[in-house]
Amino acid sequence: QIRPGHYAMWTGRIYFLAKEGGFEQFIVLMTFAVQKPLCLVSALFAGLILSSCSSSQRQVEAPARLPAYSFVPGKTAVLHNGKAIPPRNAPVQVKRAIAAANSLVNKPYRMGGGHRKHYDTHYDCSGSTSFVLKEAGLLTSTRHSKLFLNYGQKGTGDWISVYAKDGHVFLVICGLRFDTSGSGRRGEGPRWRVDGRNTRNFLVRHPTGL
């Protein structure tokens, strides 16, 4: 039996079992010919595991609590009717990310939403995070929250930060938090939020160069 967060190898494929709250899904990480020598396949599998372990040792843990939004001229976005307005000097990719996030505001929450199709009627935390980064050209395929633990580079970004742990992920873009939780209301979908939130056990990553 495979537990969430673990790898497995059989029938010509290497799998990763991701968990999003109570939702579990196998993700194919690598395929290979069954006829390929077992020693070579085992070496590839071992290399994948070691790489994952090595990456996790270089992670940066988020502080125990993310502070509430604070306006900084030329650096932070501002909210207007629930939508974010980016600073004029923000990079194009950041503006695209904000526009993508704005398009999801008021979408309802559903576990697995945004995973089966890019433009969906409902989104969960990793579905909405993936949508925003993909629209900005900063991600090529939808990920579950666990897989964001190795996204981009470690630490907070100048413009975009990704806060991730096994079971949840959210973004901070230009000082505003884009999250599906944190308001205390169950079933609420992706929203811009200005209040602080508990980030204990989260790791923080950012897109390269941002």
Predicted regions mapped to residue ranges:
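Bacterial N-terminal signal peptides that target proteins for export
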Residues: 30-41
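C-terminal motif of bacterial Sec signal peptides marking the signal peptidase cleavage site
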Residues: 51-52
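Post-signal peptide N-terminal segment of mature Sec-exported envelope proteins
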Residues: 56-92
